[in-house]
Swiss-Prot record:
InterPro entries: Kinase-like_dom_sf (IPR011009), LipoPS_heptP_kinase (IPR009330). It comes from Escherichia coli. Kinase involved in the biosynthesis of the core oligosaccharide region of lipopolysaccharide (LPS). Catalyzes the phosphorylation of the second heptose unit (HepII) of the inner core. This is Lipopolysaccharide core heptose(II) kinase WaaY. The gene is waaY. Its EC number is 2.7.1.-.
Length: 230
């Protein structure tokens, strides 16, 4: 269950009504935590592995600096991406699928439905990234395929199933960095085609979503070719 409250000037969404997540957020705002490793550091996104009295977590701050006016207008017609992601992650895991890494809290600075800053606490999954494997073993591919089928059956997406987003842990293969977008047949097909491209897992489902993606891809290539001749 995800609880939603106003807390310290933020819209705060946290797991299982557990006060430890408010404590960790307090420590983060006070800069009272240990950074174990910087995982990403670009202009609008900071991701670190941090150590707290409750253990290690992935700490992420996203503060988009471009297209602010466009993002503000879109916020009135589109849902909140990260709010949807924390709710969907909790729903899927509550249904018994622990394949996705957990999402513990989300804090947003909001004006109406527009958020300018997103602060997140996410499960740290220890293990070996597929990026570090020269060849992906067939049993790992089979496990990923089965788990992705379960994820799609529960109407959730990866959105970007490349090698860097899969970790072989002591408890099996886990997926990180999932999508908060709504789940459609076309987006499921894009997941499957990306797994075929990046992981060598053949797409065996050729449904409406699959043919829609193929048609759109061919159409874009055709238009690009026409523009090149113009």
């Amino acid at each position: 269950m995800i609880t939603s409250i106003r807390y310290r000037g933020f819209s705060f969404y946290y797991k299982d009504n557990d006060n430890k997540y408010k404590e960790i957020f307090d420590e983060i705002l006070a800069y009272n935590f240990k950074t174990v490793k910087v995982l990403r550091n670009i202009d609008d996104t900071k991701v670190s592995l941090i150590d707290t009295k409750y253990g290690r977590y992935v700490f992420k701050v996203f503060a988009p600096k471009t297209k602010r006016n466009e993002r503000f207008l879109k916020s009135f017609v589109k849902g909140d991406y990260y709010q949807n992601l924390i709710v969907e992650t909790d729903r899927v895991r509550s249904a018994g699928l622990t394949f996705p890494n957990d999402f513990y809290f989300l804090a947003e600075r909001k004006i109406f439905n527009y958020a300018s800053v997103f602060i997140m606490l996410i499960e740290y999954v220890e293990g070996v990234e597929l990026n570090d494997m020269p060849i992906i073993p067939e049993n790992v591919k089979a496990e990923i395929k089965a788990s992705m089928e379960k994820l799609h059956a529960l109407n959730m997406l990866s959105g970007d199933p490349h090698r860097g987003n899969f970790i072989v842990s002591k408890d099996g293969v886990r997926i990180i960095d999932l999508s908060g977008k709504s789940c459609t047949a076309e987006r499921k097909a894009r997941d499957r085609l990306a797994m075929e491209r990046h992981l060598g897992i053949a797409n065996e489902i050729k449904d409406y979503g699959y043919y829609s993606v193929i048609y759109r891809t061919k159409l874009r290539k055709f238009i690009k070719k026409l523009k090149g001749k113009a």
